[in-house]
């Protein structure tokens, strides 16, 4: 029930006469209903905290009879700031909002002080609660207790005992991972990605029930000292992360220095020697990776497959003993959302084509203007046509399957399997429709000529400052990134360049 509180002193009665009535009217208007509990102290000074109506309000609030309190402004509650804060604190602890009718009050010096003090008290209480909670947790950690269920694969959290017990079914998988990784005779010796793919193919589910094992999950398991019986707690410093998150900023969680972390002994799943050897192998793998000089691709991060929609990344291939490079949409790593259709294009061929077009733009700007005029109508309309055909195919596929279910009398028909296919087709149709809408939106938007002109001008200025004969691969990449938004490969002869 909504409660309204009004007050007028003897002096104010003499001056204003109907002050109580005007306050009640304003509070009811704010509440938006006449169905309210009224608490009125008539002829009582705001200096006093003990008032009949205010006492009844506080008592009813403690009994849970009140859901919200509306008051004209804080000086109706009390003339003293401390008393205002006492009442406000009582209500907030019972999750009862205190609302003031007078909107101008918040901007007055008194109002600013009230809300500042209210905020300060609230922060102080939070800090004290956090301090007590944190202190209690630390003491429990130091006594060897497990504070939080971290859903650690291979273990079960026993809340009553505050311990971790080995979950043998999952522990077998942990041992398998370590054995595969550390055994020289294993087909996956030192291969994190190979183990992740193997677990996925075996149908082993992760702790969260996922069917796909990401290589990073396997790496984290291999690096986790809990599996040799040393469980780290108090590892992360989350100070300020909640506030940052509420403010819409990225929350930063820091890892505390090892000497500040608290290690609790738990049952080991693998021997300490095997865990140490796994760390050595992981370190060797990292050093090996860093020692390899990566090939520099002109169109890194810009290429997309026009068939499956995957991004195309650079890969090294070998033919007749010689290395060469391609752009491919194939994703071989474990956990990839889409494996891709396998389209590849020679890096040299694609680079020549794209750089050839860019060179024309920066040496003959009029060609860029003509290209921009044709770009949207050609590229987007062709892509839209392909997607609309795919949508039509999925619709027909769903219709055929639905007809099959409704007309068939065959008891051997796997209805569940057919329903699963229908769901997959619906998902595909939804994704295609979303892409279709996105393209249609792009086609409706007029070219931003000022943005295009600026992009071209920056590219031309950069090109002229270096000179055609002095351009390095990095210089070409800079120029390409000024102008090119994305390169889409439909087939070996159809390449679309989307520009800014």
Swiss-Prot record:
DNA-binding region: 152-288
Keyword terms: Coiled coil, DNA integration, DNA recombination, DNA-binding
GO molecular function, one term: DNA binding
Pfam family, one: Zn_ribbon_recom
Coiled-coil parts of chain: 372-448
SMART domains, per database record: Resolvase (SM00857)
The Resolvase/invertase-type recombinase catalytic domain, residue ranges: 1-144
Gene3D superfamilies the UniProt entry points to: Putative Large Serine Recombinase, Chain B, Domain 2 (3.90.1750.20), Resolvase, N-terminal catalytic domain (3.40.50.1390)
GO biological process terms on file: DNA integration; DNA recombination
UniProt function note: Putative site-specific recombinase having a very important role in sporulation. It probably plays a role in the recombination of SpoIIIC and SpoIVCB to form sigma K factor.
Stated name of the protein: Putative DNA recombinase
Taxonomic lineage from the root: Bacteria, Bacillati, Bacillota, Bacilli, Bacillales
Gene behind the chain: cisA
């Amino acid at each position: 029930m909504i409660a309204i509180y009004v007050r007028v002193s003897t002096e104010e009665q003499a001056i204003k006469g109907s002050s109580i009535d005007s306050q009640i009217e304003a509070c009811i208007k704010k509440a938006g209903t006449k169905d309210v509990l009224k608490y009125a102290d008539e002829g009582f000074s705001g200096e006093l905290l003990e008032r009949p109506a205010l006492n009844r309000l506080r008592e009813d609030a403690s009994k849970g009879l009140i859901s919200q309190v509306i008051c004209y402004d804080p000086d109706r509650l009390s003339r003293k700031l401390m008393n205002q804060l006492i009442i406000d604190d009582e209500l907030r602890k019972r999750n009862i909002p205190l609302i003031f009718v007078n909107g101008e009050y918040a901007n007055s010096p008194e109002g600013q002080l009230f809300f500042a003090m209210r905020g300060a008290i609230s922060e102080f209480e939070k800090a004290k609660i956090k301090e007590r909670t944190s202190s209690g947790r630390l003491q429990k950690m130091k006594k060897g207790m497990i504070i939080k269920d971290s859903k650690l694969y291979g273990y079960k959290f026993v809340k009553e005992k505050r311990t971790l017990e080995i979950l043998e079914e999952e522990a077998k998988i942990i041992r398998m991972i370590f054995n595969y990784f550390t055994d020289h005779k294993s087909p996956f010796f030192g291969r994190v990605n190979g183990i992740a793919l193997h677990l996925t193919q075996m149908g082993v589910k992760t702790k969260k029930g996922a069917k796909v094992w990401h290589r990073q999950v396997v790496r984290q398991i291999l690096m986790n000292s809990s599996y040799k019986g040393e469980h780290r707690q108090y590892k992360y410093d989350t100070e300020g992360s909640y506030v940052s998150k509420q403010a819409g900023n990225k929350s930063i969680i820091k890892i505390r220095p090892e000497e500040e972390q608290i290690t609790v002994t738990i049952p080991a799943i693998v021997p300490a020697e095997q865990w140490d050897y796994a760390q050595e192998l992981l370190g060797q793998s990292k050093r090996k990776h860093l020692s390899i000089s990566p090939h520099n691709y002109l169109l890194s991060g810009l290429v997309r497959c026009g068939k499956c929609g995957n991004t195309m990344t650079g890969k090294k291939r070998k033919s007749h003993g010689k290395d060469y490079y391609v752009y491919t949409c194939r994703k071989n790593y474990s956990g990839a959302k889409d494996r891709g259709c396998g389209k590849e294009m020679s890096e040299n061929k694609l680079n020549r084509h794209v750089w050839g077009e860019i060179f024309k733009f920066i040496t003959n700007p009029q060609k860029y203007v003509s290209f921009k005029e044709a770009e949207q109508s050609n590229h987007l309309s062709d892509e839209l046509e392909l997607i609309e055909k795919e949508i039509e195919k999925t619709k027909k596929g769903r219709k055929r399957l639905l007809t099959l279910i409704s007309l068939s009398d065959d008891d051997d028909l796997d209805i569940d399997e057919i329903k699963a296919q229908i769901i997959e087709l619906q998902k595909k149709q939804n994704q295609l429709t979303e892409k279709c809408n996105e393209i249609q939106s792009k086609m409706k938007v007029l070219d931003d000529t000022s943005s295009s002109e600026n992009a071209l001008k920056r590219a031309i200025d950069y090109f002229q400052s270096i000179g055609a004969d002095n351009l390095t691969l990095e210089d070409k990449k800079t120029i390409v990134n000024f102008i090119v938004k994305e390169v889409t490969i439909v087939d070996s002869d159809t390449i679309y360049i989307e520009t800014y």
